[in-house]
Curated annotation (Swiss-Prot):
PANTHER family for the chain: PROTEASE SYNTHASE AND SPORULATION PROTEIN PAI 2 (PTHR35802:SF1)
Pfam families reported for this sequence: FMN_bind_2
Taxonomy, superkingdom: Eukaryota
Official protein name in the record: Uncharacterized protein YKL070W
One GO CC annotation: mitochondrion
Lineage: Eukaryota, Fungi, Dikarya, Ascomycota, Saccharomycotina
SUPFAM superfamilies: FMN-binding split barrel (SSF50475)
Coiled coil: none
Length: 169
């Protein structure tokens, strides 16, 4: 992603954006057997060999004492994206905040200098990493779903503690 120098941000800002809201878009891609552009011509989009995949899912952001970070998320077992993630080495998660069109008419100096142009204002964070799939670990799944739910429920005054209820599912 191209970032103009005057819009580069600090680590703390990126951390805050990736935490609130926690919804991110998980992207993965692999080389197609048909060549670099083979994915464009494939008609079977359910095939995990299709080439590209994106899933919109909430994440839990974990920060360790040594300054390293980890994103944790849950995909349904039958989601074809899981198969692709098991076969790729890298993935990308994109978090976005609010965005808005910026009119040059909003700048008072525009009438004098005519040096303002329309633009689009937004905030986004790209997080690159290596996917790790965890299967058949009920304790991990319960803990992950509880942590994700607690992360959101604590924002509500009447937030619920769902940890005890999750085991029924």
């Amino acid at each position: 992603m191209y970032i103009p120098k005057h819009f580069e941000s600090m680590e703390l800002s990126r951390y805050k954006l990736s935490k609130k809201p926690p919804l991110g878009t998980l992207f993965s891609s692999k080389a197609s057997r048909q060549g670099f552009f083979g994915w464009r011509t494939s008609s079977n989009k359910d095939d995990p060999d299709f080439g590209m995949c994106a899933s919109h899912i909430p994440f839990v952001f974990v920060e360790f004492d040594n300054g390293e970070h980890k994103l944790i998320a849950h995909l349904a077992r039958k989601n074809k994206h899981v198969e692709m993630l098991e076969r790729v080495q890298k993935c990308l998660v994109v978090f976005q905040s609010v965005d808005s069109y910026i009119s040059p008419a909003w700048f008072p100096m525009k009438k004098k200098t005519h040096k303002f142009v329309p633009t689009w204002d937004f905030a986004a964070v790209h997080v690159y990493g290596t996917p790790r799939i965890i299967r058949d670990d009920k304790d991990w799944l319960i803990n992950m779903l509880s942590t994700l739910t607690d992360q959101e429920e604590e924002k509500r005054p009447e937030g619920e503690n769902v940890r005890s209820k999750v085991e029924r599912f």
